[in-house]
Each structure stands twice: as C-alpha cells, then as structure tokens.
C-alpha cells in the first residue's frame, strides 16, 4: 500500500511548513492528485487517519481533488481529450497523445494556524 508512504511524505511536508511558519496546528490539507498516479483515495484517507495522530494535523480536514486524465494530439491539434479507456492513441488520426493533465500529485494548500 504505497498510499501510506505517500501520506507520510505529505504530513512531513505539512509539519515542516507549520514549523517554518510558527503554526501550532494544521487545520486543512488540500491535495490535487491525478488519475494517472493510481492512488486509491480510500487508502490515502485511511493513511491520513492513522498517521495524523500526535501531529499538528491531528484535527485537520483532508480534501482531495482528483484531476481527470486528459491529453492532446500533436498531429490534429485536438486538446483536452478525456482518456477514459487509457488508450494513448488519438481516435481521429491514430497519433500518440501527450498527457496534459492527470499526473499531478501536489499539496495545493495548507491552512496553518
């Protein structure tokens, strides 16, 4: 379950930022995670519940935004193509698509108090 390691890293970053800014608690953590990352949301939330105990994030709210997988075609200039079947070929011309969204894994913001 790599979600435990991911959440451990997120909480370490959040704790470091809280320390740097003199915050006594972390009220909220908002994440943006792309579909292409293969992160299981329920497992990440479970890891958050388990790992936040005894940290500044113990009472924090976790918000996770899932970024849909999208691509563009370099040949026919089609942009914002949804990739529901995970095929990386353009349905119109057969060119290999370029992923433009869905790879994200970032802390969008921390609410520190």
Language model: regions and residue ranges:
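Short cysteine-rich clusters marking metal-coordination/redox-active sites
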Residues: 73-76, 90-93
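Short hydrophobic/aromatic patches at helix-to-coil boundaries
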Residues: 109-113
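Solvent-exposed beta-strand sheet faces enriched in polar/charged residues
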Residues: 30-32, 63-65, 108
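Immediate flanking context of iron-sulfur cluster ligation sites
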Residues: 62-71, 82-84
């Amino acid at each position: 379950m790599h979600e435990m390691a991911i959440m451990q890293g997120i909480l370490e970053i959040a704790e470091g930022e809280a320390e740097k800014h003199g915050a006594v608690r972390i009220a909220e953590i908002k994440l943006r995670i792309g579909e292409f990352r293969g992160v299981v949301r329920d497992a990440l939330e479970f890891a958050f519940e388990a790992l936040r105990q005894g940290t500044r994030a113990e009472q924090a709210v976790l918000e996770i935004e899932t970024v849909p997988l999208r691509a563009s075609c370099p040949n026919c200039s089609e942009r914002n193509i949804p990739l529901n079947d995970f095929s990386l070929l353009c349905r119109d011309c057969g060119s290999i698509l370029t992923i433009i969204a869905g790879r994200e894994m970032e802390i969008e913001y921390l609410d520190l108090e």
